[in-house]
From Swiss-Prot:
The keyword 4Fe-4S applies. It comes from Staphylococcus saprophyticus subsp. saprophyticus (strain ATCC 15305 / DSM 20229 / NCIMB 8711 / NCTC 7292 / S-41). The gene is moaA. Binds 2 [4Fe-4S] clusters. Binds 1 [4Fe-4S] cluster coordinated with 3 cysteines and an exchangeable S-adenosyl-L-methionine and 1 [4Fe-4S] cluster coordinated with 3 cysteines and the GTP-derived substrate. This is GTP 3',8-cyclase. Keywords: 4Fe-4S, GTP-binding, Iron, Iron-sulfur, Lyase, Metal-binding, Molybdenum cofactor biosynthesis, Nucleotide-binding, S-adenosyl-L-methionine. HAMAP family: MoaA_B. It comes from the Bacteria. S-adenosyl-L-methionine binds at residues 30, 75, 126, 197. [4Fe-4S] cluster 1 binds at residues 24, 28, 31. Coiled coil: none annotated.
């Protein structure tokens, strides 16, 4: 039986984000800049990561509190060995209606069929440019956009529902918006443009680098005949639009200009097994991994997860201003640990 719970702001819990690794094969400046995450950077050892059995146990308990959707994140989740086994186990859980994966897409041809066979159907691919030179400058690994586009085509061909996520930075890749809308208009792929956020401690964020939803929409409207689309469900983070001629849709995610804290229903488990109630958390999360490994029962997990959600009052993006960002003294948790 599912117990319906809410946090201090009346928000239910519906989504669980599981970060399966802190490692990534890209070095994008806004997430894992190469100057910090260099060849000598020490990532988490294997025994500090949650095991698949631990993740499944956590997810099973969360379904009793109302979780219906699970998203696998990282780091780059396709670097975690035997990920298809985790997908298969999660798919067996009663109450789980949807499992998704967020990836940079580089390893989709290598692992995609196994993941599909395990029951995964939805993939979000992070692709911040369609121009090879622009994309290579962002990922700092000399990986071409055309390589990722081929991986996306492969994923679509074997049956995945694919969305493309684009983090837009002023003066970096805002010139990619129109060509990317054009490219994906006639593909069976939905593209979403995300306002640049101040996630983690190392991405050099400030307001001047943000391209707002209104600015993005103006660029698109100058080149395409579009119309808005009604939200599909409570807590949907993207504002969707469709082309009038072929009804192909794209989304704009207003993470800075019009925050969606009031409808956020996501719990997060970091790659080292800690609970976070917000992508912008500054307080080190409750250590679920240690709690479990010290002998916690399923009922104790249930009560702990319930208590953590009941006291949740995070609304960072609602409160963000240039001054609050400048004055922030406590470090945020980096995105490769907490998951995007």
């Amino acid at each position: 039986m599912v117990e319906q719970i809410t946090d201090k702001l009346g928000r239910p819990i519906r989504d669980l984000r599981l970060s399966v690794t802190d490692r990534c094969n890209f070095r994008c400046d806004y997430c894992m800049p190469k100057e910090i995450f260099g060849d000598d950077f020490v990532f988490l050892p294997k025994d500090e990561l949650l095991t698949f059995d631990e993740m499944v146990r956590i997810a099973q308990v969360y379904t009793q509190l109302g979780v219906k959707k699970i998203r696998i994140t990282g780091g780059e989740p396709l670097l975690r060995r035997d990920l298809d086994k985790l997908i298969y186990q999660l798919n067996q859980l009663e109450g789980v209606e949807d499992i998704g994966l967020t990836t940079n897409g580089l390893l989709l041809k290598k692992h995609g069929q196994k993941l599909y066979d395990a029951g995964l159907r939805r993939i979000n691919v992070s692709l911040d440019a369609i121009d090879d030179a622009v994309f290579q400058a962002i990922n700092n690994r000399n990986i071409k956009a055309s390589t990722i586009l081929q991986q996306i085509d492969y994923a679509v061909a074997i049956g995945f529902q694919v969305k493309v996520n684009v983090v837009v930075q002023k003066g970096v890749n805002d010139d990619q918006i129109v060509p990317m809308v054009q490219y994906f208009k006639d593909k069976d792929v939905q593209i979403r443009f995300i306002e640049f956020m101040d996630v983690g401690n190392d991405n050099g964020w400030d307001f001047s680098k943000v391209v707002s939803k209104d600015e993005m929409l103006e660029m698109i409207e100058q080149n395409f005949d579009i119309e808005p689309v009604a939200p599909k469900y409570y807590g949907e983070v993207a504002k969707y639009y469709q082309h009038k001629d072929n009804k192909a849709q794209f989304g704009l995610i207003t993470s800075v200009s019009q925050s969606f804290c009031s409808t956020c229903t996501r719990a997060r488990l970091s790659s080292d097994g800690k609970f976070y109630g917000c992508l912008f958390s500054t307080v080190d999360g409750f250590n679920v991994k240690s709690f479990m490994r010290n002998g916690a029962t399923d009922n104790e997990l249930f009560e702990q997860f319930k208590a953590l959600w009941n006291i949740r009052d995070d609304r960072y993006s609602d409160e963000r201003t240039e001054q609050t960002v400048a004055n922030r003294k406590r470090k945020k948790i980096n995105m490769n640990y907490i998951g995007g």
